[in-house]
Amino acid sequence: MYTHYLKNLVSFKSVTPNSAGAIEYIDDLLKQHSFKTEIKIFGDSKKEQVTNLYAIFGGNEPNICFVGHVDVVPAGNYEFWHNSNPFKFHEQDGKIYGRGTVDMKGAIACFLAASLNFIKNNTDFKGSISFLITSDEEGKSKHGTKEMLQYIYDQRYKIDFAVVGEPTCEKEIGDTIKIGRRGSVNFKLNIVGLAGHVAYPHKANNPLPCLIKILNELINIKLDEGTEFFQNSNLEVTNIDVDNDTSNTIPASAAAHFNIRFNSLHNVETLRQLIEQIIKQYCKEYKVDYKLEYSSSAESFIQNPNDNDKIKKFANVIERTLKIKSKFSTSGGTSDARFVKDYCSLVEFGLLSDMAHKINEYTKISDLQKLYNVYYNFLIEIL
């Protein structure tokens, strides 16, 4: 059942932010099984239009919602794929190949199968099952899950617990549950000096010594020691640019870009204050000006499993189903869980992450079966 759904989902060339028919396929499938569905298209322009779906079966609490995305990253050169078509279902040696099989059409297929079988086998269950699916997670994530959550809550829908189907597992299905994510903030620093000839440095003010001093301190700063569920926060310099191709000219300015992935001990504003304090110190010493810009796609968040019965139940289901004790993790990049956490508690749990976004992306059929079993048994446990 899940392989059938995955075969159909892979066939849609849903490169972000395009649904390419994938969400419409899910909508039609769920309608056939008596789900109440609504598709909403959000976006500032035609190029940015994003397709979103909310579908629900039942009207009672708790409402267990699967949150996912059909959009995928570009497939690259088709010639490097086994069957020269990453959007055609290809099964070989117990594996299913195709763009999005891991991230995250495989998880969508498994939760679809688990939900429909659960409803078929448990006609008198109490509660609701819902799906929130977008075509804008791999891109800007501006008009997808974030806007759709606000819309459905304006319509008075309430989600009690969400399963986000990101590929979280590392070596085997069940070994990792994501219960939070690090925050991310990007900085762009521009040091403004005074251009001049290298033979007359006293008539110029080179911005580079100041920038070098600042970056040296930033890369050596110890932001924290980490927490029970988070690794230590980390700063990485990603670009240095002086826009100067001549060797006899002192540049007028020098710029650097850097990113901080941070845990729950910080937020964007406290980090900005710390960074700016260091910058001001050196700019004063070197008598240069500066401009600091920053942007953040996510604050950090954490849900302590010790304080959340539904997260505990999810972990217990994995242990009973797969005979493996899951590790609670906050590693990796950002995901749509950063939007969901403002509305309800959640876990992120899906397939193995190793092949996500890679040429010849694949998942094992046996892993799909394991994921299906976990999803199905969790619905039994919670509803």
UniProtKB/Swiss-Prot annotation:
Disulfide bonds: none annotated. Homodimer. One of its GO terms (molecular function) is cobalt ion binding. GO terms for biological process: diaminopimelate biosynthetic process; L-arginine biosynthetic process; lysine biosynthetic process via diaminopimelate. Zn(2+) 2 binds at D103, E138, H357. Keywords: Amino-acid biosynthesis, Cobalt, Diaminopimelate biosynthesis, Hydrolase, Lysine biosynthesis, Metal-binding, Zinc. The gene is dapE. Catalyzes the hydrolysis of N-succinyl-L,L-diaminopimelic acid (SDAP), forming succinate and LL-2,6-diaminopimelate (DAP), an intermediate involved in the bacterial biosynthesis of lysine and meso-diaminopimelic acid, an essential component of bacterial cell walls. Its cofactor is Zn(2+); Co(2+). Its EC number is 3.5.1.18. Binds 2 Zn(2+) or Co(2+) ions per subunit. Transmembrane segments: none annotated. Zn(2+) 1 binds at H69, D103, E166. The keyword Transferase does not apply. The active site is at D71, E137 (proton acceptor). It comes from the Bacteria. Pathway: Amino-acid biosynthesis; L-lysine biosynthesis via DAP pathway; LL-2,6-diaminopimelate from (S)-tetrahydrodipicolinate (succinylase route): step 3/3. Pfam families: M20_dimer, Peptidase_M20. Belongs to the peptidase M20A family. DapE subfamily. InterPro entries: ArgE/DapE_CS (IPR001261), Bact_exopeptidase_dim_dom (IPR036264), DapE_proteobac (IPR005941), Peptidase_M20 (IPR002933), Peptidase_M20_dimer (IPR011650), Peptidase_M20A (IPR050072). It catalyses: N-succinyl-(2S,6S)-2,6-diaminopimelate + H2O = (2S,6S)-2,6-diaminopimelate + succinate. This is Succinyl-diaminopimelate desuccinylase.
